[in-house]
Amino acid sequence: MQIAIAGFLIVFSIGFISSSDQSNDKQKGAHVFGSLNATNLQPFVKNNYNWITIVPYSGQKNEDSPNLVYHRGNRLELDRRDSVWSHQIQVAHALGLKVFLKPHIWMHNPSEGKWRSDIFPTNEDNWDLWQKNYRKFILFYAKIAKKNNVELFCIGTELSRLTAEKSEFWETLIKDIRHIYSGKLTYAANWRNEFEKITFWKDLDYIGIQAYFPLTKNTYPSVEQISEGWQKHLLSIEQVHKKYNRKILFTEMGYKSTADSAIKPWEWIENYSNPKDLVSYETQANCYKAFFSQVWDKDWFEGVHIWQLRSDYSESDSTLNLDFTPQGKLAEGVISKGFE
């Protein structure tokens, strides 16, 4: 999922455990932008969420760069970051929320049409340096996960070319992480041309999917039309589940508040005033209704982390809000009811 990042951004995700027997263990989460505290977490708890995912970023110039920057290169900065993430984890745990730590790479200046799925160093020297830097980045956060008893850790997000061509690297990295961290592990694979091809699912606890599947070719689709669009994707998802005997976790899923949101759910809104981006809270709500009717109750389904909510949300934000957040919209009630 491509997003615009300004400054030092913290992303969170929250979920909760259902009272129904069939979904007692499902993760019920949503990515949330902004810092968290005991007060601004209450609306999420009220709406039946109880997992929180913290997303630390490492910066990379472009798809060819071997350098990853997640601190200023000194011990003081590392200690500060450790303190920030540890505090957020402790706030969540104090409220009874479980934590999913999910590192991402953000490219500052990618080539046209490229994003993090295209990251691939151009020669062996650059590859050696990139894997060394990525390993440091991931193990730094694995240590924070261990220190703070984090329940779930993500080894990477949407690095499609690297998972396809460098599987040995990931297998070794997983072993290195498990030497440090004893909790559950997953990887957040792109829905397109990645999750079916990964060979190291057997070494992880969940099959993670960034679930922006195209579900219709229609604007203003009905719940029935969107539900029909899920069928072919469910077949491929279930095949991977059966092959590796691992439950499926939607590490990310979301829909804009637009009439075309089920056509290409992964697309970010570039121009919020563009009249072609027609506001449709009903379409967003219909997308979630279809998800709960077609996916949620599958025995192989572990849960979902919805994109994206805000810790500083106010009701006035949603008046002309085309964005992914369900807050203050029809979808908010659909999700809350689905998570009961």
Predicted feature locations:
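Aromatic-lined substrate-binding rim segments of carbohydrate-active enzymes
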Residues: 41, 58-110, 165-186, 228, ...
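Substrate-binding cleft and catalytic face of glycoside hydrolase catalytic domains
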Residues: 50-66, 84-163, 307-312
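The substrate-binding groove and active-site-proximal loops of carbohydrate-active enzymes
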Residues: 29-31, 67-82, 120-135, 156-165, ...
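Boundary/entry segment of secreted carbohydrate-active catalytic domains
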Residues: 20-47, 55
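Aromatic- and acid-rich polysaccharide-binding/catalytic face
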Residues: 138-142, 148-157, 189-227, 247, ...
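Bacterial Sec-dependent signal peptides at the C-terminal "C-region" and cleavage site
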Residues: 1-25
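Aromatic-rich peripheral "rim/lid" segments of glycoside hydrolase catalytic domains that contact
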Residues: 267-269, 273, 282-290, 294, ...
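Aromatic-lined carbohydrate-recognition surfaces of secreted/lumenal glycan-active proteins
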Residues: 100-105, 154-164, 171-196, 245-253, ...
